[in-house]
Amino acid sequence: VFRNGIKEYLDGEIGRFDEKAPGFLDRFMGSRPQVFLDILESVIYEVARKGEGVIIGHGSQMLLRNFDCAFHVRVFSSDQRRIDNMAAQQGLSREATLKLIRKRDQEQSGFFNFAFHLEMNDPSLYDLIIHTEKLDVDTAAGLIIQAARSECLRTCSLNALEAMDRLALEKRVHAALLESGQDMNTIIVEVPEKGTVHVYGIS
């Protein structure tokens, strides 16, 4: 769902970014990072607003942490299991596969730390953590589905949905002002209600 959102909402240079792509952090650091972050956050909120979707990574565990209707899952496995799976899927040597895994891990970790000043493996960011060393994909998926359908999880209230709308609009306005060359250190953007934007500046 998130990738569809990216295609729908992003284009041009920023649309090329992918949290998991090799070389991401190098490109990210040299390409107006705050504009990218604003648009990324806006897309996360817009996609989440539609409901019943799956967002993979991209800081969603941080951005949606205050919404009770968002269920955050971390799935991980041993390096050995990851190497075996990727080597078989992509036909790479074990040495090349290990280098690629290390590179992607560093890029994801670097992105998350830069964007949110947190470590993405912090267990407090997740509602469910699954180690797939002894579980196959279907079993792990079944655990996630069962938990997501639990009565313990709340559906998104109207207030939560409206908050996502306002946050998405706020981030888009913030990005547009940055793109126009405004000094955002002297500007405050507020969205008190859907469709209404207040911009305050200090001259």
Residue spans for each PLM region:
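ATP-dependent small-molecule kinase phosphotransfer cores
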Residues: 1-52, 92
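Small-molecule kinase domains that catalyze NTP-dependent phosphoryl transfer to phosphate-bearing small molecules
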Residues: 2-19, 94-137, 165, 175, ...
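Short, polar loop motifs at secondary-structure junctions
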Residues: 57-62
